[in-house]
Amino acid sequence: MQKGETNKKMSCYKPLIRIYSPEHREISGQVYSLARFSERVGKKLKYEDLMYEPKVMLIPCGQCIGCRIQQREDWTTRIELEARQWPKEQVWFITLTYDDDHVPGMILSTGEIMRKVQYVWKPGKKTPESVQTLLYTDVQKFLKRLRKTYESRLRFFCAGEYGEQTARPHYHMILYGWEPTDLKQLYKIHHNGYFTSETLCKIWGNGNVQIAQATPETYRYVAGYVTKKMYEIDGKKANAYYELGQQKPFACMSLKPGLGDAYYQEHKEEIWRQGYIQCTNGKQAQIPRYYEKMMEKENPERLWRIKQNRQKKAIEQKRLQFEGKDYKTQLETKERVTKKQTEKRGIL
């Protein structure tokens, strides 16, 4: 790979088509599916037909399984790059859980949110009378109290989800800017210590707090929960949460600026020159889409050239690998394989 080129691959299995025209800003940004774009030009097209079109670019759909896996990778990278801006002793992996006296839930007949709620089923009924639920305001209040107590600038990435076996709500968080003073070890796994803090438990006020030093593994763990839940809330899962009145699994994070922004501002030329992010574990990560959006604001022509080179190489490489199959067919085959793999593993 030459300097100035990106090694990012098209991870989307259902790419959309975007028109870019610097001299006609009113049509820049228009997006089409391959079928709709074929209708627009009046003939059936293949992705290969667009390879060398200077004003046409393939962009991720943001919804397919390939895009969701890439979103997990992007978040993992951004969480790590944010951590590089903080001392190690101020970056922690935290799990917030509820005790029986504080676990939130809903009475389905009234929609009332209450504490001390358990899942209650009546014989012969398809839905319970009451369910436990995530409560985003609990996270907001926790962070507000934490900032007030320590009078420090805090940043975070938080995923709210339900336990696999008990469906009990809890939260996983990467917390930046908090430096504990009263850690008490709970146990160790493979040399990694897990702690609690009386101060943090009081600030949380709803149950237990488990704390561990943040690592690349925990960054990926939290980001993985986000994408996993995004995938699970499609279809039947989405209907189940809706019917039960539960808050769907969610992610929330520090904004303005977004996570990893400071690293980008300090290293943007290096990032675009080398075309990848060098991670702590020795691996090279693709440049997050968040960074591409910032580049698009700063220098859209440069980003367009980078994406054009990436697109040509991706399609040409697939053409050589799978001679006789068009790019769309290859993507459909790859999507089926990826779905089977993720279903088998039970994760994204």
Q: What are these model-predicted stretches?
A:
Residues M1-E80:
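DNA replication initiation on ssDNA origins
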Residues E5, H24, G29, V41-K43, ...:
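Intrinsic-disorder/low-complexity loop/linker signature
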Residues G62, W92, P169:
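Residue-level detector of short, conserved catalytic/binding motifs and their immediate flanks
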Residues G62, Y136-Q140, R220:
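A structural signal for well-ordered alpha-helical segments within the folded catalytic domains
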Residues I65, T95, F157-A159, Q210-A212, ...:
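Residues in well-ordered beta-strands of folded domains
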Residues Q70-Q165:
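Signature for HUH/AEP ssDNA processing cores
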Residues E129, S152-R153, G163-P169, M173-N309:
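Conserved His + Asp/Glu catalytic blocks
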Residues G207-Q210, R305-L348:
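C-terminal non-catalytic accessory extensions
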